[in-house]
């Protein structure tokens, strides 16, 4: 009836997990109690959970990403603390099986639920506004994609308290992830979390590809698209091509585990190296799925705070497209030690070095944009300059690892871990936080606090180097990844420094929380409010509408005649808002409960039941998912019109605020 599920699956004998569970329950009850006390359930359901508005979904994606940051960082600081303590005769405070689950969950959460969710949140808010669209191409799929991602994140966290998580790392290499070596439910939690979130991500890629190709404003040709939109397009193409490979790889691993197949086992004709090829054929494009949009963020931020147009727009676009193509030609550099031979290794090593060329072009373009510019060092520019320094170092170490001979020495060492975090934190996280600071006034109507934002940057920047430069050093000294104990006295001081770095990063996260609190508290101060909709003297269309934008984004769809049309119109004194124009009724999609209610619950039921072999319940969940999608397809009540009078009222109110601001 309940498959493998029993009371013994609840880890009551692990004090850390019991304490965590009690803390989660207390926080959960407090949050639910506050929502109930203030009577916000109806509001949250109608205006947020069922929303198909790309702007609200963007906010929910970013909230999900920040929650994932807290969980993923908790895992990170636990690992750093274990390695600071577990030296010589001291075993540390984490048993090996628990430590293995922590590093596996850390990687899974940070990539799939922090980085991917943050990226999708930025896409959702910015892309439709930058191309002059009123929504995305498929609003329901947008809602469904979010809830698939949220369900997968819930599934990962359920494994904390019911069963266990994978102990095989964030990519679940076989044969360790096969039944013989991982007979528990941990790998199954991993499989279904990745598969469900992968569905959401694939739908997102399709959605934004179609949105950018088909819904650009009149006159916005390919050569007039903002660079951030170009990066979103390239990332969407990468998603559509790469994520099916992940689905197949993890699906075949699931067939090994559930049906006794032998795709990746050491017997029965299986080949574990096939899994590595498949997972990294997805995995390296995934790195660029994450970092290319960060490049797009910097391509918007640097011109805005340098007071100049972006240097080398065409080369930026060509470089982005080159990186997109080359990202599929480098995956073997993750396992030069496989034994494919010198010719294969030489090809992929050279391809890896070549991909640094378009990346270098981007870096020089940003520097030339800043050159002789009127640079304003807002918090956004701190993150941008910090990225340029940090990502350059990460790129240099990447070129080192692209040399097969060097990789034979450094493979599977902490040098590799330091390089990976150098690119993901220094490139992806710095980029997304930069974008959050930049576009926050557009989202919320008020600026983020500059003082706390700069403090957060410095703690993150210094903490990052304290945490990961020591890993380069101990990697050179031979320390391999995934160790939970060591005896080498030369490593211990460096790992203590890394622990200090993790604490500094924790203070950086605390500063970011404080920044949010202070910004919300002081949102009505004149210097913080964004009445104009253009607080940074921006160049692209998103700054031409109010902050926050109305539900329809643009009362009149803009016409684009040049790159940076909005900036040119401002310089020429053209009224971009067309105040007083004759407005028309605007066609918009209706909110839906199909994705946020029925489909979400069914997917969660299916995933949990499949983990525990509760097949009757899994069938119920699967039928629920399929039935919900079919029912939604047959639903005709999916849109409505905003009356022209309502549009005029909203636009006139914004005009009144602008006039009042000018009078002040």
UniProtKB/Swiss-Prot annotation:
Q: Give the position of the cross-link 1'-histidyl-3'-tyrosine (His-Tyr).
A: 284-288
- In terms of superkingdom, the source organism counts as Bacteria
One term of GO molecular function: heme binding
Binding, Fe(II)-heme a: 419
Residue positions binding heme b: 106, 421
**EC code(s) of this entry:** 1.10.3.-
**Carries keyword Oxidoreductase?**
yes
The family annotation for this protein states: Belongs to the heme-copper respiratory oxidase family.
Q: What is the protein's name according to its record? A: Ubiquinol oxidase subunit 1
Taxonomically, what lineage is the organism? Bacteria, Pseudomonadati, Pseudomonadota, Alphaproteobacteria, Acetobacterales
């Amino acid at each position: 009836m309940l498959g493998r599920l029993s009371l013994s699956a609840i880890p009551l004998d692990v004090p850390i997990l019991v304490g965590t569970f009690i803390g989660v329950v207390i926080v959960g009850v407090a949050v639910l109690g506050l929502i109930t006390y203030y009577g916000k359930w109806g509001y949250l359901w109608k205006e947020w959970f069922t929303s198909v508005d790309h702007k609200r979904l963007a906010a929910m994606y970013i909230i999900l990403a920040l929650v994932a940051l807290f969980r993923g960082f908790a895992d990170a600081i636990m690992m750093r603390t274990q390695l600071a303590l577990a030296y010589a005769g001291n075993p540390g405070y984490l048993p090996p099986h628990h430590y293995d689950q922590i590093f596996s969950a850390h990687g899974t959460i940070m990539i799939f639920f922090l980085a991917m969710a943050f990226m999708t949140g930025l896409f959702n808010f910015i892309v439709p506004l930058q191309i002059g669209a009123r929504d995305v191409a498929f609003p329901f799929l947008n809602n469904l994609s979010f809830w698939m991602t949220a369900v997968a994140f819930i599934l990962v966290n359920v494994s904390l308290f019911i069963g266990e998580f994978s102990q095989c790392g964030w990519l679940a290499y076989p044969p360790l992830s096969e039944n013989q070596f991982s007979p528990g439910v941990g790998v199954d939690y991993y499989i279904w979390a990745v598969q469900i979130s992968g569905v959401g991500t694939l739908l997102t890629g399709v959605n934004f590809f179609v949105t950018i190709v088909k819904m650009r404003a009149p006159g916005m040709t390919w050569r007039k698209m903002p660079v951030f939109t170009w990066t979103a397009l390239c990332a969407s193409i990468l998603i559509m091509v790469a994520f099916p490979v992940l689905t197949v790889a993890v699906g075949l691993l699931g067939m090994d585990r559930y049906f006794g197949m032998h795709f990746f086992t050491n017997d029965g004709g299986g080949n574990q190296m096939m899994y590595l090829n498949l997972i990294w054929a997805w995995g390296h494009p995934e790195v660029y799925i994450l970092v290319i949009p960060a490049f797009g963020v910097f391509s918007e931020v640097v011109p805005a705070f340098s007071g100049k147009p972006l240097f080398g727009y065409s080369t930026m676009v060509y470089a982005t497209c080159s990186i997109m193509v080359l990202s599929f030609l480098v995956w073997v550099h993750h396992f030069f030690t496989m034994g494919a031979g010198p010719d294969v290794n030489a090809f992929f090593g050279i391809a890896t070095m070549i991909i640094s060329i378009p990346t270098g072009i981007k870096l020089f373009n940003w520097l030339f944009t800043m050159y002789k510019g009127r640079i304003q060092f807002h918090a956004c520019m701190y993150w941008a300059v910090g990225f340029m320094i940090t990502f350059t170092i990460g790129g240099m170490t990447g070129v080192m690892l692209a040399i097969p001979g060097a990789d034979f020495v450094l493979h599977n060492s902490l040098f590799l871990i330091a390089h990976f975090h150098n690119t993901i934190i220094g490139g992806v996280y710095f980029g997304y936080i930069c974008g959050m600071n930049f576009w926050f006034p557009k989202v919320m109507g008020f600026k983020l606090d500059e003082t706390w934002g700069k403090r957060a940057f410095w703690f993150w920047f210094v903490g990052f180097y304290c945490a990961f430069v020591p890993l380069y050093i101990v990697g050179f000294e031979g320390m391999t990844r995934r160790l939970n104990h060591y005896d080498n006295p030369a490593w211990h001081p460096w790992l203590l420094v890394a622990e200090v770095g993790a604490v500094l990063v924790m203070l950086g996260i605390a500063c970011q929380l404080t920044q949010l609190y202070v910004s919300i508290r002081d949102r009505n101060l004149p210097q913080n409010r964004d009445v104009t909709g253009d607080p940074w003297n921006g160049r692209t269309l998103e700054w031409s509408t109010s902050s926050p934008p109305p539900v329809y984004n643009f009362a009149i769809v803009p016409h684009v005649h040049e790159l940076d049309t909005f900036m040119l119109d401002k310089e020429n004194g053209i009224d971009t808002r067309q105040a007083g124009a004759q407005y028309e009724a605007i066609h918009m999609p209706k909110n839906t409960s199909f994705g946020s209610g029925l489909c979400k619950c069914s997917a969660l039921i299916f995933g949990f039941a499949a983990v525990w072999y509760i097949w009757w319940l899994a069938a119920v969940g699967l039928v629920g998912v399929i039935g919900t999608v079919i029912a939604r397809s047959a639903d005709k009540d999916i849109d409505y019109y905003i009356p022209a009078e309502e549009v005029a009222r909203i636009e006139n109110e914004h005009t009144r605020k602008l006039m009042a601001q000018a009078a002040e």
